[in-house]
């Protein structure tokens, strides 16, 4: 059987890629006491370290962990759309810290498990009117930006 080569996404726009960034975890193992009180950070540049938030919102260097992952996919020329999957209580918080962008960004609620959140992201992608132009999907955990 001969392997069929599938072209990879590139800058020519022949195959678009969607990024699903999964950030719906509450990070209870990383928290002391397992309790969070969402702060209303209004930008990636806020000086709070954010330990009262899930770890994807903790500061790493000059911005939250999730911002590092988001920025990478946002800058990548093959990424046509980004779907951010966030725990329901943090959707407003995420919306407040997102920078303005030219790429379509879709913010949706995640599920009880990582698998449920990935499924929610894929369902949201399938519902986009131009999803037939997406040839690849990159699924990334926001809490692992490096």
Q: What name fits each language-model region?
A:
Residues 91-97:
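Acidic helix N-cap motif at the loop->helix transition within catalytic regions
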Residues 77-78, 99-104, 130-131:
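Short helix-capping segments at alpha-helix termini
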């Amino acid at each position: 059987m001969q392997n069929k080569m599938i072209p990879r996404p590139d800058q020519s726009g022949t195959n678009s890629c969607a990024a699903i960034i999964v950030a719906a975890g509450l990070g209870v193992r990383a928290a002391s006491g397992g309790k969070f009180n969402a702060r209303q950070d209004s930008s990636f540049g806020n000086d709070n370290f954010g330990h009262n938030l899930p770890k994807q919102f903790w500061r790493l260097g000059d911005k939250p962990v999730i911002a590092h992952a988001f920025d990478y996919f946002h800058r990548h020329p093959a990424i046509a759309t980004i779907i951010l999957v966030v725990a329901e209580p943090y959707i407003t918080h995420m919306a407040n810290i997102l920078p303005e962008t030219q790429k379509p960004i879709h913010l949706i609620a995640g599920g009880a498990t990582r698998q449920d959140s990935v499924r929610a992201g894929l369902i949201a992608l399938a519902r986009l009117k131009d999803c037939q132009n997406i040839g690849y999907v990159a699924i990334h955990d926001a809490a692992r930006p490096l």
